[in-house]
Amino acid sequence: MKLIDVVSARKIIETKATEKVEFNLAYKFAKLIKLTNDDEEFYNKSQREIFEQYAKRDDKGNVLPDENGRYQFDTDKIATVESELRKLATTEVAIPESLKFTVEELTPLKFSVEEVMIFSSLIKDNDDEK
């Protein structure tokens, strides 16, 4: 599973975490969050390092944020930043099959189509078993 999918799926789980669900599903959510804590920390740290490495700087070497406080990049560095971020996002992360979900387990919850697409790497589709 790709690192970006893990990070995105964690965000979805966190939005569902306050809903009352069957114990088995809540337990699986909790185990998955716990298992992927280091992955999310690695992603956030690495992303920050990429931004810091290529960000525009003033003459004293300090990062020059834009008016919204976000990182800015010189035009000639944007492709490199995008490439580095893509490489980070596509880093493979192993998720045990036992922590993947069946459609039936997730049916009691409400998901947007976008959330289902993000979460799909963690779903054991019945069609996969045929």
Question: What kind of feature is each model-predicted range?
Answer:
Residues 2-56:
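N-terminal interaction modules that seed assembly of large macromolecular complexes
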Residues 41-130:
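Low-complexity intrinsically disordered segments
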